[in-house]
């Protein structure tokens, strides 16, 4: 599939099935762990560092699986799922930019939570700015990101790191 500047849910599902970047290359999670419904924009030279930018969205539906179990009587989307979504997007960016291998989260420098995602929300927006993209034996991306709910920033992450690995058996 040729790289595009935006992707639908159907495209993202194909990525999860390994049909976007080729067999053995970057995949998004499938089913319930895919934390976005669309990528509205992805660029190779956007963002304040000129290294790339990604914007994606998740439509909130009160019937989403995590609201039933986190927490009973006090439903809130787990913050770790928003963090994972940002890692998913850094990995997607690396595959989109031609990187070979399977993505693995390598860490994050700092995370701040200043709000929550409730079942009454309408939309979550993820915004990532690539700070560094290493294209050597190891493909690795470093990005800063935010999670917004209905236009308000509620999570901030600095130095999200994802690498692509040809062999994950020793990881």
Swiss-Prot record:
User: Any idea which residues are catalytic in this one?
Assistant: 70
Please list the GO biological process terms of this entry. Answer: unsaturated fatty acid biosynthetic process
GO molecular function annotations of the record: (3R)-hydroxyacyl-[acyl-carrier-protein] dehydratase activity; trans-2-decenoyl-acyl-carrier-protein isomerase activity
* Record-level GO cellular component terms: cytoplasm
- Keyword tags: Cytoplasm, Fatty acid biosynthesis, Fatty acid metabolism, Isomerase, Lipid biosynthesis, Lipid metabolism, Lyase
Q: What is its EC number?
A: 4.2.1.59, 5.3.3.14
Specify the domain of life of the species encoding this protein: Bacteria
Q: Which family does it belong to?
A: Belongs to the thioester dehydratase family. FabA subfamily.
Functional summary from the UniProt entry: Necessary for the introduction of cis unsaturation into fatty acids. Catalyzes the dehydration of (3R)-3-hydroxydecanoyl-ACP to E-(2)-decenoyl-ACP and then its isomerization to Z-(3)-decenoyl-ACP. Can catalyze the dehydratase reaction for beta-hydroxyacyl-ACPs with saturated chain lengths up to 16:0, being most active on intermediate chain length.
Q: How does it assemble?
A: Homodimer.
What name does UniProt use for this protein? 3-hydroxydecanoyl-[acyl-carrier-protein] dehydratase
The protein's organism comes out as Pseudoalteromonas translucida (strain TAC 125)
């Amino acid at each position: 599939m040729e790289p595009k500047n935006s992707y639908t849910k159907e495209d993202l599902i194909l990525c999860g099935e390994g049909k976007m970047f080729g067999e053995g290359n970057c995949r998004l999670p499938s089913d319930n762990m895919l934390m976005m419904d669309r990528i509205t924009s992805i660029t190779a030279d956007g963002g304040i560092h000129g290294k790339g930018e990604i914007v994606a969205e998740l439509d909130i539906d009160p019937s989403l699986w995590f609201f039933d179990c986190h927490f009973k009587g006090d439903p809130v989307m787990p913050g770790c799922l928003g963090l994972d979504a940002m890692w998913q997007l850094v990995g997607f960016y690396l595959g989109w930019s031609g990187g070979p291998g399977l993505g693995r989260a390598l860490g994050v420098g700092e995370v701040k939570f200043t709000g929550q995602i409730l079942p009454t929300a309408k939309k979550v927006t993820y915004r990532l700015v690539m700070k560094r993209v290493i294209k050597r034996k190891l493909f690795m991306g470093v990005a800063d990101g935010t999670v917004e709910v209905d236009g308000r920033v509620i999570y901030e992450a600095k130095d999200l790191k994802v690498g692509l690995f040809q062999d994950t058996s020793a990881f």
